[in-house]
Amino acid sequence: MATTLNPSEISELIKTRIEQVKLSAESRNEGTVTSVSDGIVRIFGLADAMQGEMIELPNKTYALALNLERDSVGAVVLGDYEHLREGDVAKTTGRILEVPVGKSLLGRVVNALGEPIDGKGTLGPTQTAPVERVAPGVIWRKSVDQPVQTGYKSVDAMIPIGRGQRELIIGDRQTGKTAMAIDTVISQKHTGIKCVYVAIGQKSSTIANIVRKLEENDALDHTIVVAATASESAALQYISAYAGCTMGEYFMDRGEDALIIYDDLSKQAVAYRQISLLLKRPPGREAYPGDVFYLHSRLLERAARVSEEYVEKFTQGEVKGKTGSLTALPIIETQAGDVSAFVPTNVISITDGQIFLETDLFNAGIRPAVNAGISVSRVGGSAQTKIIKKLSGGIRISLAQYRELAAFAQFASDLDETTRKQLERGQRVTELMKQKQYTSMSVANQALSIYAVSEGYLDDIPVHKVLTFEEGLHAHFSNTQGALIDKINNSGDWDNNIEAAFKQHIEEFKTTGSW
């Protein structure tokens, strides 16, 4: 017997089904790839694309929109582009490039997109943040008044660096720029400063050596290594610095201190020049595009010391009464010591000072090869440890006078007593400023060495024995005055009691003759 359906039941059933249907409309702008070459794709039809927007291409490949023209968009592919073809569909995403940030990145080696490349598995819990961000405004900034100890006597005494400062390390190839940066990272082991090391356009073997050295010195646990090797595309080398900065800002925004090293921005500028020329942008001086200054200024301005109010506002009241900082140490490689080239002068004008490393000093065995005459720190003086600031005042003058007199003494046959003493003091100061790699020195030991040379205790020590004397002096104080050394390292203060103790025990050590 056939069942008959009641018309009212049919209408009720249709009504129920209609109510259950979920319609979602997603508006996405689509275009067509018209050409692919050298990592650059030209796309016709993406009328609503935004500057810096992520463009989705086939096989989960993404490109970054950089040129917005009347009928087409020029985008740079992030990753491999061999599989892309003319006629492929390209879609806008409405998002700008983001990278993972968070504490789970510490101790890891990642690429420019934040993907781990160290073979240690996936990252732990992370958030994401855009690679491009507006730097903190004037109102949210605080003055730099806390030091970043590099562990180098010559830097901490003459060219001090403060938390939130931008200090350029500049010099020819093979003058110890990377060595100085890595030693600074190693020196932060017990300071609580988180470090980000961005390797731009370097050999994979060099980066592997750096990671190994950080591991050997127990410094990888507080460091994120962002690697954009020489074999990677210009786009990833260009992006890597901004990605590393975003990872460092995560700590600054939450009331912590971070240090970022860009090694080096010369190669980033070359990568950006390559992208710009391929995008047919008009070249300027040295074939760089017109906005190469903005390339570095918008990156380095993100390094800052931010106020308690900024941190409290960013964390929505979770963190109160703490300031955050991001200290930047950009590295620039010069050609034959020419600091007046385009990119070096740009970065010198953006930063708060520069440490100039000289080939002649390096070859003469004076390492770190810091040229005290043209190296300067514009804001670090106010952040210098009290004891180092008090004792190191005469060091820079002694060195400058020594260099001047040494040049003059080559032409003079006989020298008066004062000049001869200045030359001998200068020789000992120069010798004392030498320091081997991976031998970070504490504040107390730096103060001890500077006090000894400033007060003339090394004047009767042969120049070739100065470093041996220094080593013995540090060991003597460590064995007999451990409490005093700890006190200086913890407080950084200077008073008459410390001076009396220094004087007494240096004289005592000299009488032993055990160096």
From Swiss-Prot:
It holds the Pfam family ATP-synt_ab. GO terms for molecular function: ADP binding; ATP binding; proton-transporting ATP synthase activity, rotational mechanism. CDD domains: ATP-synt_F1_alpha_C, ATP-synt_F1_alpha_N, F1-ATPase_alpha_CD. The keyword Nucleotide-binding applies. It comes from the Bacteria. Disulfide bonds: none annotated. It is an enzyme of class 7 (translocase). It is found in: Cell inner membrane. SUPFAM superfamilies: C-terminal domain of alpha and beta subunits of F1 ATP synthase, N-terminal domain of alpha and beta subunits of F1 ATP synthase, P-loop containing nucleoside triphosphate hydrolases. It catalyses: ATP + H2O + 4 H(+)(in) = ADP + phosphate + 5 H(+)(out). InterPro entries: ATP_synth_asu-like_sf, ATP_synth_asu_C, ATP_synth_asu_C_sf, ATP_synth_F1_a_nt-bd_dom, ATP_synth_F1_asu, ATPase_a/bsu_AS, ATPase_F1/V1/A1_a/bsu_N, ATPase_F1/V1/A1_a/bsu_N_sf. PROSITE patterns: ATPASE_ALPHA_BETA. PANTHER family: ATP SYNTHASE SUBUNIT ALPHA, MITOCHONDRIAL. NCBIfam families: atpA, PRK13343.1. This is ATP synthase subunit alpha. It comes from Xylella fastidiosa (strain Temecula1 / ATCC 700964).
